[in-house]
UniProtKB/Swiss-Prot annotation:
PANTHER family: HEAT SHOCK PROTEIN 90 FAMILY MEMBER. A motif (TPR repeat-binding) lies at residues 719-728. It comes from Gallus gallus. This is Heat shock protein HSP 90-alpha. Homodimer. The TPR repeat-binding motif mediates interaction with TPR repeat-containing proteins. Molecular chaperone that promotes the maturation, structural maintenance and proper regulation of specific target proteins involved for instance in cell cycle control and signal transduction. Undergoes a functional cycle that is linked to its ATPase activity which is essential for its chaperone activity. This cycle probably induces conformational changes in the client proteins, thereby causing their activation. Interacts dynamically with various co-chaperones that modulate its substrate recognition, ATPase cycle and chaperone function. Belongs to the heat shock protein 90 family. GO terms for cellular component: axon; cell surface; cytoplasm; cytosol; melanosome; myelin sheath; neuronal cell body; nucleus. GO terms for biological process: cellular response to heat; positive regulation of cell cycle G2/M phase transition; positive regulation of cell population proliferation; positive regulation of nitric oxide biosynthetic process; protein folding; protein stabilization; response to antibiotic; response to cold. One of its GO terms (molecular function) is protein-folding chaperone binding.
Length: 728
């Protein structure tokens, strides 16, 4: 037996090859070893997860070729702490690694996540995120000073990898105890990390992190028990003791702890009895809980769901809501879906994997980034789907064509929407959900025509009547006026901006509620959401706004149109191509004018959003953004005085300047940007000068900026000062 150990540790014949760690890996290991982390326990979670992945792989291969399991049918993970040697060993009967795998996976080829993880660590990220970056195996160095990996793959010999993390590692052929197939990771623990050899501590970590691993995790602990034997037996045991020293892991070992007093206690005609301590190996399965999604939902507590959610997602917070269901009939599958408490910071990044639902087929893990399983707008959902009908050896290409998967997807979307609707009944929790995932709901309305109606019921908005509460479209409809035919909304940047907008003046005066849409995605959402419960959605910033009015109001409006028809024509001539038309408004109360867009063009807000796109299409910008209509308020003193001025002398130069000033100011107040802000600013400065009584021909001003004075649009001189004051 000692010879075998010697061969394993220092093989005489086999050559030992030494390799250097790839620079990034060496850097990562140095970071792990030299930094203090409070939660070092995650090393065990990572190593058990790696074992589970290796077992998944061999099980997956055996489905098409059962002979792959001839080297060991029992799929399991064993944990063996050894206090005497200060080692913790993790053994699995997974797929194992070839020599090439060992060299590549454990040292010479950096995973894509290595650099990203180091950057995250240096930025203050938690070490427990290591598994998400594909470098979990290096977490062993949180607790170990040396790591030995012995592995056997069906297609190769048994090899041993070893490193003390000094920048290099060795690989050699291993002649030790044959594994059959699988991997044995031996951690030679640091002096101050012996807590991880304690039975209680190992159980605690496995329960916390690896309870739902699909393979049995067995813990082997050496224990002692009292046993009564006769004197003769005790002597025999003493003689055998030395021979058995090497076999303590496999057979009980006995040591004499009998005392003289015990020897004196005899039963007349019976032989002397002796009490001895017997060592034995206690084996205990740590994860008897079967996969939670296969159990009856009525038997599962919220705490169990919470534990499973955390083990599935590595989230530190509890989930917000859960949906556990099974579908039976022509198609059978079980699913467990979770809504997280908060959205990840990179939720809408293109490079991010598109979903987080793990796909299992008959309890065998297949993949965790199957894009066909759930639409992109639901990519924040977490969970598992376990199908009974998909073939186990299904490829990505086959999945894309699979009708079964399309049915599963349809059911998952349906159940997600059911879950959100249930969540909406709890105002407090729905508020948390909506703050995090409202963009996803709106994206769904834009993309998913089939479920648009259900998704629209989940929308919540501030309105002119809701105060600080967000309300649903259904709530809005129940509060509509008797003669109101439309749902009115306005889009903009902030709640205050839209609430003070000129567009909502008359509606608010008439007590008509207006929905405030203040997220950029709302613009895309309402392009697709044309109506709600038979009521058309109407933007108050677009032309042709129909407000409920009686015959008398209609008659008055017609009279005003006739009265201001001439002014509208003059203003259109002055503004030329800047606007499509100038009309009398029915939406203004306190503002003199506003700019509205055509029914099918972009709103001012949409134009702003599109201008901000780095890859925008300028040709689209041209025809979508050009249709502007100027609406004037016939009841406003500025417009009335301007009408009188224009009718008195339509060639009056100040009229032209005032019209342009009104137009540019209306552009700004309506949410558009100015093409030439400097010219507008100069006009305003001249108005200020007139207001302050400063002589326009002031020579000092001319000397200061002669060029600007020349370029400035003409405002009439002193003769017109009184006229300007009239307009004010």
């Amino acid at each position: 037996m000692p010879e075998a150990v010697q061969t394993q540790d220092q093989p005489m014949e086999e050559e030992v090859e030494t390799f250097a760690f790839q620079a990034e890996i060496a850097q990562l290991m140095s970071l792990i070893i030299n930094t203090f982390y409070s939660n070092k326990e995650i090393f065990l979670r990572e190593l058990i997860s790696n074992s589970s992945d290796a077992l998944d792989k061999i099980r997956y291969e055996s489905l098409t070729d059962p002979s792959k399991l001839d080297s060991g049918k029992d799929l399991k993970i064993n944990l063996i702490p050894n206090k005497h040697d200060r080692t913790l060993t993790i053994v699995d009967t997974g797929i194992g690694m070839t020599k090439a795998d060992l060299v590549n996976n454990l040292g010479t080829i950096a995973k894509s996540g290595t650099k990203a993880f180091m950057e995250a660590l240096q930025a203050g990220a938690d070490i427990s995120m290591i598994g998400q970056f594909g470098v979990g195996s290096y977490s062993a160095y949180l607790v170990a000073e040396k790591v030995t990996v012995i592995t056997k793959h069906n297609d190769d010999e048994q090899y041993a990898w070893e490193s003390s993390a000094g920048g290099s590692f060795t690989v050699r052929l291993d002649n030790g105890e044959p594994l059959g197939r699988g991997t044995k990771v031996i951690l030679h623990l640091k002096e101050d990390q012996t807590e991880y050899l304690e039975e209680r501590r190992i159980k605690e970590i496995v329960k916390k992190h690896s309870q739902f691993i699909g393979y049995p995790i067995r813990l082997f602990v050496e224990k002692e028990r009292d046993k009564e034997v006769s004197d003769d037996e005790a002597e025999e045991k003493e003689e055998e003791k030395e021979e058995k020293e090497e076999k303590t892991e496999d057979k009980p070992e006995i040591e004499d702890v009998g005392s003289d007093e015990e020897e004196e206690k005899k039963d007349g005609d019976k032989k002397k009895k002796k009490k001895i301590k017997e060592k034995y190996i206690d084996e205990e399965e740590l994860n008897k809980t079967k996969p939670i999604w296969t159990r009856n939902p009525d038997d599962i507590t919220n705490e169990e769901y919470g534990e499973f959610y955390k083990s599935l997602t590595n989230d530190w917070e509890d989930h917000l809501a859960v949906k556990h269901f099974s579908v039976e009939g022509q198609l059978e599958f079980r699913a467990l879906l979770f809504v997280p408490r908060r959205a990840p910071f990179d939720l809408f990044e293109n490079r991010k994997k598109k979903n987080n639902i793990k796909l299992y087929v008959r309890r065998v893990f297949i993949m965790d980034n199957c894009e066909e399983l759930i639409p992109e707008y639901l990519n924040f959902m977490r969970g598992v789907v376990d199908s009974e009908d998909l073939p186990l050896n299904i490829s990505r290409e086959m999945l894309q064509q699979s009708k079964i998967l399309k049915v599963i997807r349809k059911n998952l979307v349906k159940k997600c929407l059911e879950l959100f609707t249930e969540l909406a009944e709890d105002k407090e929790n729905y508020k948390k959900f909506y703050e995090q995932f409202s963009k996803n709901i709106k994206l769904g309305i834009h993309e998913d025509s089939q479920n648009r109606k259900k998704l629209s019921e989940l929308l919540r908005y501030y309105t002119s009547a809701s105060g600080d509460e967000m309300v649903s479209l259904k709530d809005y409809c129940t509060r509509m006026k008797e003669n109101q035919k439309h749902v009115y909304y306005i889009t903009g940047e902030t709640k205050d901006q839209v609430a003070n907008s000129a567009f909502v003046e008359r509606l608010r005066k008439h007590g008509l509620e207006v929905i405030y849409m203040i997220e950029p995605i709302d613009e895309y959402c309402v392009q697709q959401l044309k109506e709600f419960e038979g009521k058309t959605l109407v933007s108050v910033t677009k032309e042709g706004l129909e407000l409920p009015e009686d015959e008398e109001e209609k008659k008055k409006q017609e009279e005003k149109k006739a009265k201001f028809e001439n002014l509208c024509k003059i203003m259109k001539d002055i503004l030329e191509k800047k606007v499509e038309k100038v009309v009398v408004s029915n939406r203004l109360v306190t503002s003199p004018c506003c700019i509205v867009t055509s029914t099918y063009g972009w709103t001012a807000n949409m134009e702003r959003i599109m201008k901000a796109q780095a890859l925008r299409d300028n040709s689209t910008m041209g025809y979508m953004a050009a249709k502007k209509h100027l609406e004037i308020n016939p009841d406003h003193s500025i417009i009335e005085t301007l009408r009188q001025k224009a009718e008195a002398d339509k060639n009056d130069k100040s009229v032209k300047d005032l019209v342009i000033l009104l137009y540019e100011t209306a552009l700004l107040s309506s949410g558009f940007s100015l093409e030439d802000p400097q010219t507008h600013a100069n006009r305003i400065y001249r108005m200020i000068k007139l207001g302050l009584g400063i002589d326009e021909d002031d020579t000092a001003a001319e000397e200061a900026s002669p060029a600007v004075t020349e370029e400035m649009p003409p405002l009439e001189g002193d003769d017109d000062t009184s006229r300007m004051e009239e307009v004010d």
